[in-house]
């Protein structure tokens, strides 16, 4: 069976080795976001630069509270089960967070190790403390997931037995008021997953044109009142805080609509957060890289919580499954396309009603999984390995 395991110092001399935590401070990984100029639709960033030091000071205490990042992993049983058949070696947790899924996998499968990456340094610190008991079976690298190959090189790992992406913002990030992700708490308009990046929610809200704001709200939040909200934001700038922004959004939405469908600012906050962190922009390359790095028999699993995320996951998995075949769907492939994965499930799996009752943030979760296979021409393999 193929192995994706690297030899650690502890394996060489028999002594226990603490978990490795590789920080961006070493300059190993170019994961800091550099915003584009106004010609690319991202507005002026000087406002963010003036307030970075204050925001960073508020967030710097996050790593002191490792317990804060403990949360209930979504679809935990399903995640553990789907990695039961992968070869021994390293599984990449591309969105490590507090390490909940990683901990379950390490406990369930002694043959697996975890390479955890996350752009949130506070989460990495917390996960490193939580998973320290696993010694050299756990390594953490501060990185965005579209830099996963660089992270693997830094950790001296050439291939992986699988990968897990748990997309979106985590519960601890939402609950930490000063991070600025939530419309329920008063805080600066931050919304950065990596607080070292200069680009923040304030830059989007106060720097984008009306057309740019409409695009963000439509594309990232499916917000049907995007034009009204964008005009209200422009009229009330500068906007300093999350509660100020939430109030402006609520006032811009018709009263009859505000009474149903959850908090009126939810979609807009989600849309701005996605824009700040380039979440949809960097996802396709990350998925392609994860599939490429995975050994035969390994699996790539993605938990998404937003229709835009799920569309991208479905499209990239479909592309790998079909080899980007251009032949008519009802005719044999003659273009020479080679498939590299098979879908473990053709339809996304969703949480059980019991799980949703116990963890409301799991309600929108969608799980999609592919398994790496030997390259083969289209039509030579079964389409799925599990029932629909």
Set out the residue ranges of the language-model regions.
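S-adenosyl-L-methionine-dependent methyltransferase catalytic core, i.e., the SAM/SAH-binding region
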Residues: 2-388
């Amino acid at each position: 069976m193929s192995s994706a395991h690297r030899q650690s110092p502890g394996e060489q001399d028999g002594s226990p080795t603490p978990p490795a935590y590789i920080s961006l401070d070493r300059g190993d990984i170019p994961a800091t976001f550099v915003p584009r100029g106004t010609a690319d639709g991202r507005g002026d960033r000087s406002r963010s630069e003036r307030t970075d030091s204050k925001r960073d000071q508020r967030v710097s205490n996050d790593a002191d509270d490792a317990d804060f990042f403990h949360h209930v992993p979504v679809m935990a049983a399903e995640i553990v089960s789907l990695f039961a058949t992968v070869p021994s070696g390293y599984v990449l947790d591309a969105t490590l967070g507090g390490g909940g899924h990683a901990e379950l996998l390490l406990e369930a499968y002694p043959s697996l190790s975890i390479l955890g990456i996350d752009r949130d340094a506070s989460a990495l610190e917390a996960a490193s403390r939580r998973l320290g008991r696993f010694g050299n079976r756990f390594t953490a690298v501060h990185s965005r997931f579209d830099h996963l190959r660089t992270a693997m090189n830094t950790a001296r790992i050439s291939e992986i037995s699988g990968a897990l992406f748990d997309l979106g913002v985590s519960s601890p990030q939402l609950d930490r008021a000063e991070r600025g992700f939530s419309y329920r708490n008063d805080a600066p308009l931050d919304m950065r997953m990596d607080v070292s990046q200069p680009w923040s929610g304030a830059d989007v809200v106060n720097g984008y044109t009306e057309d740019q704001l409409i695009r963000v709200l439509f594309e990232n939040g499916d917000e049907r009142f995007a034009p009204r909200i964008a005009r209200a934001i422009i009229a009330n700038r500068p906007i300093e805080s999350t509660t100020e922004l939430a109030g402006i959004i609520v006032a811009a939405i018709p009263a009859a609509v505000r009474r149903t469908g959850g908090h009126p600012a939810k979609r807009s906050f989600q849309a701005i957060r996605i824009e700040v962190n380039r979440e949809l922009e960097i996802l396709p390359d990350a998925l392609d890289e994860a599939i490429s790095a995975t050994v035969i028999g390994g699996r790539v699993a993605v938990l998404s919580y937003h229709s835009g995320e799920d569309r991208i996951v479905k499209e990239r998995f479909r592309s790998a499954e079909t080899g980007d075949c251009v032949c008519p769907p009802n005719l044999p492939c003659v273009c020479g396309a080679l498939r590299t994965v098979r879908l473990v499930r053709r339809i996304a799996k969703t949480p059980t009603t019991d799980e949703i009752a116990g963890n409301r943030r799991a309600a929108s979760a969608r799980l999609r999984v592919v398994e790496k296979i030997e390259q083969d021409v289209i039509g030579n393999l079964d389409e799925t390995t599990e029932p629909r």
